[in-house]
C-alpha cells in the first residue's frame, strides 16, 4: 500500500510535490475507508485529486505511471534514454535531475524507494527497508564516472555473484 509519493522536476512539477495517503485523525467511516498497518500508520484506501484545469492533476498520476513503466521496461540497450520529462518552463530545470521517492508497505513491511535520474541516465536508485524503527539500505545503484555501481546490503539480502552479474548486464553501464 502506498504511503506517499514525492516528485520534483517532473512534467509540470518544478518544486517538490507530495501526495500522501496517510489518514487524518478523523474517524468517519474508518472501518471502510482506512487501513491500519501493524506499526499504527493509518492509510486511506482512496484519494481524491481535484483542482483547476491545467493544475497538474493528470501529471501527478503520470508520476505513478512513469514509475510502473520504469520498473517494467525491458531494454538490452544500456544507453537507452530513461524517458523522464523534466520541468521545461524554466531555464535551469531541464539540466537538473528528476527525483521520485515512494514510501509503501509490501506484505506489511515498510519500504522507501528513491530514484534520481536525467533524461539520459539513472543517477541514483535506492531501496530502504524497515526491519526496525530505522530504515536499512537494501540496494543502491549510482552513476559514478559514467559507470554504474550496484551494491546490495549482504546482511539483509543474499545475492549470489551470478545474480549480481545478470542484473549488472541487464541494467548497468
What are the functions of these language-model segments?
Residues 12-14, 42, 95, 120, ...:
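A generic structural signal for short, non-catalytic loop/turn and secondary-structure boundary residues
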Residues 37-38, 42-48, 52, 61-122:
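Conserved P-loop NTP-binding catalytic core
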Residues 17, 23-25, 91-93, 143, ...:
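Solvent-exposed, flexible loop/coil residues
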Residues 2-66:
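Pre-Walker A-like glycine/lysine-rich segment at the N-terminus of P-loop NTPase domains
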Residues 112-173:
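Electropositive, glycine-dotted interaction segments
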Amino acid at each position: 500500500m502506498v504511503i506517499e509519493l514525492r516528485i520534483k522536476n517532473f512534467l509540470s512539477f518544478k518544486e517538490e510535490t507530495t501526495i500522501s495517503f496517510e489518514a487524518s485523525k478523523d474517524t468517519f467511516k474508518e472501518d471502510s475507508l482506512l487501513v491500519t498497518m501493524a506499526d499504527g500508520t493509518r492509510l486511506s484506501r482512496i484519494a481524491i485529486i481535484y483542482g483547476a484545469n491545467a493544475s497538474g492533476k493528470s501529471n501527478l498520476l503520470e508520476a505513478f505511471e512513469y514509475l510502473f513503466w520504469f520498473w517494467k521496461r525491458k531494454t538490452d540497450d544500456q544507453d537507452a534514454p530513461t524517458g523522464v520529462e523534466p520541468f521545461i518552463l524554466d531555464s535551469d530545470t531541464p539540466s537538473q535531475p528528476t527525483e521520485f521517492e515512494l514510501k509503501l508497505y509490501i506484505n506489511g513491511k515498510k519500504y522507501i524507494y528513491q530514484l534520481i535520474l536525467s533524461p539520459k541516465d539513472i543517477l541514483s536508485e535506492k531501496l530502504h527497508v524497515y526491519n526496525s524503527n530505522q530504515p536499512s539500505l537494501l540496494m543502491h545503484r549510482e552513476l559514478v564516472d559514467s559507470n554504474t555501481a550496484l551494491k546490495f546490503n549482504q546482511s539483509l539480502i543474499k545475492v549470489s555473484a551470478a545474480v549480481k552479474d545478470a542484473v549488472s548486464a541487464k541494467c548497468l553501464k
